Swiss-Prot record:
SUPFAM superfamilies: Aspartate/glutamate racemase
Annotated gene: murI
Top EC category: isomerase
Binding locations of substrate: 12-13, 44-45, 76-77, 187-188
Domain of life, source organism: Bacteria
Protein's recorded name: Glutamate racemase
Pfam families found in the cross-reference section: Asp_Glu_race
Segments traversing the membrane: none
EC number: 5.1.1.3
Keywords on record: Cell shape, Cell wall biogenesis/degradation, Isomerase, Peptidoglycan synthesis
Amino acid sequence: MDSEDRPIGFFDSGVGGISVLKEAVKILSNENFVYFGDSKMAPYGVRTVEEVKKLTFNAVEFLLKKNIKALVVACNTATSAAIIDLRKAYSKYMPIVGIEPALKPAVECNRKGNIIIMATPMTLAESKFNNLMKRYSNSNILPLPCSGLVELIEEGKTEGEEIERYLEEKLIPLKGNGIAAVVLGCTHYPFIKKSISKVLNQDVLILDGSKGTVRQLKRQLIKYHIESNKSKIGKIKIFNSMNSQYIIKLSYKLLKE
């Protein structure tokens, strides 16, 4: 089969999807990638479903002009709000992969205590998430809306006093009943794993959906016969609606961390 060198498109409301792109670069190192972050309109988690759908379709149109062969919606909020409509519109042209919280592995670990799901308010309010919760109704799961957290990470604040103070206010009150695992339901949040561990000061499992998403992407590339056969390392291009050097530099910095 001829090598398929067209890039894989990644999209997020900002720099968060870089956490998923990092995993893809590890597993699919010979693929080319193009990433679009919509930091100008971030955060998506406080917008209406219709607003998020419109912004998501605008982002996909941008990526289609880059001649992508597959699409990864590396944003939990956009996946919740728009993945069904995206697949209706584009799945006959290319595979479309979304992301969801890594609730299944958290439940399967069978640890004592509550499973905390940190996510944006919209992700937690959407029917897609509620259906996911119903599948694990026998487990002790506590949704934790985290308004304002995406904004801190977009500013590059992944460690230090400000982010730790925010996390303390959210997480410390939940420690009393025991925490079995923390599930990161937003692709921005893996960048603060160290800070979460520091605040909780205990052996808590912290899980995100990046690996599962990339495994699904790999399966889809094989299914559609569009995986790259080249042996050399692929190229990565990052774009952002904010059109500022700061956000592009932050994106590449997060990719390398």
